[in-house]
Regions:
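Glycine-rich, basic loop-to-helix element that forms the pyrophosphate-binding segment
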Residues: 68-84, 105
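A recurrent flexible, glycine/aromatic-enriched loop bordering the glycosyltransferase active site
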Residues: 145-167, 180-182
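Conserved donor NDP-sugar-binding/catalytic core segment of glycosyltransferases
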Residues: 101-134
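Short aromatic/hydrophobic "clamp" motif used to bind/position activated sugar donors
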Residues: 89
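A conserved acidic beta->alpha catalytic loop
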Residues: 26, 43-52, 93-96
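N-proximal low-complexity "stem/linker" segments adjacent to membrane-targeting elements
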Residues: 1-29
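Non-catalytic, C-terminal membrane-associated alpha-helical segments of glycosyltransferases
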Residues: 224-228, 243-297
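Acidic donor-binding loop at a coil-to-helix junction in glycosyltransferase catalytic cores
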Residues: 181-189
Length: 297
């Protein structure tokens, strides 16, 4: 007989064994009956001991560790949802440690609504890796002032902390497999769901912690990959051209800027300063330039 769960947590991973252990420990410490949820982790061919972790991990809740060839985040998550037994899915990441009330909060949100609804929780980024986290050294990824239950735009469909009925995901065909690099596969699904009038609501009590510090230099490099994925998004939804940053002014500035010219050199010097307005401007410019280089090249 297929076990009955209220909610399935789906996580994709690749070479993240140490932090994944912390994440799984977080699900061991949930303030709810362990029989009402399952955790599915889909590994994309890790070589760091993740498979040993799968073999040794024996929690009270149902755990399913799956190993497959690397098909990107979309492939891992689609596989996880396909085997999930529950009618409701949480998508999160292998470096997102859940608050003890994380599962219960998502479950209660879906119990309380009669219509198929998606819920976006709160992910707290950490400025330094320390557990338990210091509240003074965390900040919300979503910084806007939002109210509990507030209806959100599709661009808030962020899969570090989002839940939805499995039936909606299946009806939409899941994450688009064309997105193999960094970013946009989640927002693209969110956009399709909003086109079908599926509501996305804010759930601030559903909290997890992003146990990973990304440096500004890493962000600048990563924005190239983000731009490359945005190019795929543009090909599927050309009506989003301006939302994706391709307004005439930004495109003109990019085309007039040489990657080895004086403007880039100046912005790099400003970015390397310790603080101040020039540092902020330099960092912002390099992030934007990297993103545009990904989407336009």
């Amino acid at each position: 007989m297929t076990p009955t769960f209220e909610i399935s947590v789906v996580i994709g991973t690749f070479n993240q064994a140490p932090v994944l252990q912390r994440v799984l420990d977080g699900y061991t410490n949930q303030n709810c009956d362990p029989g009402i949820f399952e955790v599915i982790v889909v590994d994309s061919g890790s070589t760091d001991g993740t498979h040993d972790l799968f073999a040794q991990f024996a929690p009270r809740f149902k755990f399913n560790g799956i190993i497959q060839d690397n098909q990107g985040k979309s492939g891992a998550r689609n596989r996880g949802v396909a085997v999930a037994c529950a009618p409701v899915i949480i998508i999160t990441d292998a470096d997102m440690i859940p608050h003890p009330d994380f599962i219960e909060t998502h479950i209660q949100a879906h119990r309380s609504t009669a219509n198929p609804t998606c819920f976006e929780g709160v992910t707290l980024n950490m400025t330094e890796l320390h557990w338990p986290p210091d509240p003074n050294k965390t900040y919300p990824y979503i910084r806007e002032s939002l109210k509990n239950g507030q209806k959100l735009g599709w661009y808030y469909f962020l899969t570090g902390n989002v839940s939805f009925p499995k039936s909606l995901f299946v009806a939409e065909g899941g994450f688009d497999m064309d997105f193999l690099g960094y970013g946009w596969e989640d927002l693209e699904l969110g956009y399709r769901l909003q086109q079908k009038k599926v509501p996305l609501r804010f759930l601030p009590a559903a909290i997890n912690y992003h146990y990973h510090v990304v440096s500004e230099d890493d962000e600048i490099k990563r924005n190239v990959k983000k731009g490359e994925s945005a190019r795929i998004m543009l090909s599927k939804h050309p009506e989003l051209k301006w939302f994706l940053g391709l307004n005439p002014l930004s495109v003109l500035i990019y085309k007039l800027t040489s990657p080895h010219g004086s403007l880039i050199k100046t912005m790099t010097k400003w970015h390397q300063k310790k603080s101040g307005l020039r540092k902020q401007v330099g960092t912002w410019f390099l992030k934007e330039y990297s993103y545009l280089s990904g989407i336009l090249n």
